[in-house]
Every structure is written in C-alpha cells, then in structure tokens.
C-alpha cells in the first residue's frame, strides 16, 4: 500500500514539474512573440487626422459618397499634433479597397506637400486631389500621411471614407441616346410608310362614268342642240 502511494506521489510530482515546464516555455514564447511584434510594428505617433471631401460633406459617416468614374475627390485635411515634440508632414498617399471585402484595387498616387512644420498642439491644413479611375461599385478610401519625427519616418493612417462609383445620367444630347432616338424614329417612319402604301394598294379604283345621251325629242325646237 505504501509502495503504491509512493508511486502515485512520484507521478504527481513528475506531472507537476512537466506542467510547470510547459507553462514556463509558453510564457517565454509569448514574451518572444511580443518582442518580435514590437520590433516589426510601425512606430506609433499621437497625431489626429481629420479631413472632409470637398463638395461631398455628409453628417452620416456610414453613408456612401457618390462619384462618377474619372471624378476627382478633393480631400481637405485638418491635422493636429498631440506629440510632445515637433513633427513635419511632407507627403500623402493611400489606397482604395473594395467594400465590404477589403480587396485592394488602386493606390493613391503619392504626392509631396509642404513640408508643414507642426509645433506641439499645433494644427495644419492642406489639400489632396484623388482621381477615381474605377469601375462602378462601392469602395473604401484610406489616405495616409507621411511625417518625420526626429530621424524616423512614420506613416499616419487617416479615417477611411465610404464612396460609390455610379453610372452617369444619360443626357438627351448624348451620342448613344441620340442614336437610339434616330433608330426609333426610323422604325416608326418605315412602319408608317409601309402601312400607308398597303392602304393605297387596297383602295378600289373608280370606274369611269359613261356619258348617256339625253332624249331631246320632247324639248321645243328652240332648246334642242
């Protein structure tokens, strides 16, 4: 009996040691993963980025801003520096992804701006034009600002904007619409012509009236021809 208890105690001790070793190993792995993540993560920066799409202001951020293909969206930025040191904004770029799946479909062409030297708690305002060369559909617009702090370059993401590319309204003078009108009028004219022609062919011809000779025997001589 004592021998069985001794074996059980030894097994429990071994299992406890094994679990402790696994726990310590997992803890080391978690710490290592955190260190790697911190090493590869982009540097954080305390910058507040707001912007409006000029001419498309909307109070509801969940609604889609409508554009036509090849339209240009003008972004008016308002950036505030909440860092405890000065920073410099020197560029803008970004990406466009599909909604709701988030597949990248276009890059916003990078452009140099400023540079804008922003003091602590300072604010800068500037603009950016984005040409929407996209097919019809729904998208996310995600702009990025490029800034420098000390000797490091940071990429600052701005809030995404929902927008939609819609088909343009058809103008009365649109060549495609005019061609449809011409074809429609030609069809009406052709049908009318053949209808009138068939009616004319079906109309019975009038027989020439025969001239009857009048009996003049009863007339006085003065009235006879």
Curated annotation (Swiss-Prot):
It is found in: Endoplasmic reticulum membrane. Coiled coil: none annotated. The chain crosses the membrane at residues 170-190. Residues 212-225 have a biased composition (Basic and acidic residues). Disruption phenotype: Displays increased levels of spontaneous RAD52 foci in proliferating diploid cells. Its main location: endoplasmic reticulum. GO terms for cellular component: endoplasmic reticulum; endoplasmic reticulum membrane. The keyword Lipoprotein does not apply. It holds the Pfam family TRAP_alpha. Residues 1-24 form the signal peptide. InterPro entries: TRAP_alpha. It is a single-pass type I membrane protein. Keywords: Endoplasmic reticulum, Membrane, Signal, Transmembrane, Transmembrane helix. Residues 203-225 are annotated as: Disordered. Residues 25-169 are lumenal. Residues 191-225 are cytoplasmic. Is probably involved in a pathway contributing to genomic integrity. Belongs to the IRC22 family. Present with 7110 molecules/cell in log phase SD medium. This is Increased recombination centers protein 22. It comes from Saccharomyces cerevisiae (strain ATCC 204508 / S288c). The gene is IRC22.
